[in-house]
Amino acid sequence: MTIRVAINGFGRIGRNVLRAIVESGRTDIEVVAINDLGQVETNAHLLRFDSVHGRFPAKVTSGDDWIDVGRGPIKVTAIRNPAELPWAGVDMAMECTGIFTTKEKAAAHLQNGAKRVLVSAPCDGADRTIVYGVNHATLTADDLVVSNASCTTNCLSPVAKVLHDAIGIAKGFMTTIHSYTGDQPTLDTMHKDLYRARAAALSMIPTSTGAAKAVGLVLPELKGRLDGVSIRVPTPNVSVVDLVFEAARDTTVEEVNAAIEAAACGPLKGVLGFTTEPNVSSDFNHDPHSSVFHMDQTKVMEGRMVRILSWYDNEWGFSNRMADTAVAMGRLL
């Protein structure tokens, strides 16, 4: 069965979702429609040439109301209200605008044909929050509006699951050192978050994140045990989670790393990776994993204080998981 999806919002995530589907060569998911308020010609150009991920791996052509990436024309519309979108024949609406992030707003896609909605962000009131590889098996046919969580929650959750299952996490605090994103300005300007009002490429910028707390939505056994902050840094892509936690029992660096390696080579293969090399952030650009654990950064103090580091391409890894989750939802239709 091939899942027919429509993408609402053709920005960083929307474009990368389409690219991930094409680049992977997968045939279990097909993009049949795109809705974005930008000009079709501009969207096609931004798809063809990407400053972070390079040129699109296939020929991109476009017309007045279509874009073709070598799999046939994809219908393109420019409609503001999701409830008015022509989604007849669409199995899954991928909500990628970053605007319709409550269940009530996202559910508007269901009014005109879409059978399910997958939101590319945390979504208040969603029927379920999914981190693929961690809890996608909990999906049911009754989950109409699903959140794909955030890129940071997708990085942290697989690591947290493995380590909690292996040694137990009593409590912990995460810092994500996160590349700047599209909601940050190139020069100082107005922003409701005064930290994010500052020029993205000129400073390290402390700000908030709900990613650690959101792990509790994915792994209920960790609810209330994790918190965190974000520091935005002057790089355009790739981020890293620095997690310090109190283990439930004494452990060692070797045990922590062995648990991660076993999961990465086993049940979480393709979602969780690991590296033993002296890598830096640019080495993980365009890496499709949700999380790449850095083995030589693991530290254990007095048996129970554990510190780990895990990298993630905050655009590409997340976009690949959007496709994975959409297919998992589609199998329940």
Curated annotation (Swiss-Prot):
Pfam families: Gp_dh_C (PF02800), Gp_dh_N (PF00044). SMART domains: Gp_dh_N. This is Glyceraldehyde-3-phosphate dehydrogenase. This protein is encoded within the form II ribulose-bisphosphate carboxylase operon. PROSITE patterns: GAPDH. Homotetramer. Catalyzes the oxidative phosphorylation of glyceraldehyde 3-phosphate (G3P) to 1,3-bisphosphoglycerate (BPG) using the cofactor NAD. The first reaction step involves the formation of a hemiacetal intermediate between G3P and a cysteine residue, and this hemiacetal intermediate is then oxidized to a thioester, with concomitant reduction of NAD to NADH. The reduced NADH is then exchanged with the second NAD, and the thioester is attacked by a nucleophilic inorganic phosphate to produce BPG. Its EC number is 1.2.1.12. Its main location: cytoplasm. Transmembrane segments: none annotated. It is found in: Cytoplasm. The active site is at residue 151. GO terms for molecular function: glyceraldehyde-3-phosphate dehydrogenase (NAD+) (phosphorylating) activity; NAD binding; NADP binding. It catalyses: D-glyceraldehyde 3-phosphate + phosphate + NAD(+) = (2R)-3-phospho-glyceroyl phosphate + NADH + H(+). One of its GO terms (cellular component) is cytoplasm. Keywords: Cytoplasm, Glycolysis, NAD, Nucleotide-binding, Oxidoreductase. Belongs to the glyceraldehyde-3-phosphate dehydrogenase family. NAD(+) binds at residues 12-13, 36, 80, 120, 314. Pathway: Carbohydrate degradation; glycolysis; pyruvate from D-glyceraldehyde 3-phosphate: step 1/5. The record marks 178 as: Activates thiol group during catalysis. It comes from the Bacteria. D-glyceraldehyde 3-phosphate binds at residues 150-152, 181, 196, 209-210, 232. One of its GO terms (biological process) is glucose metabolic process.
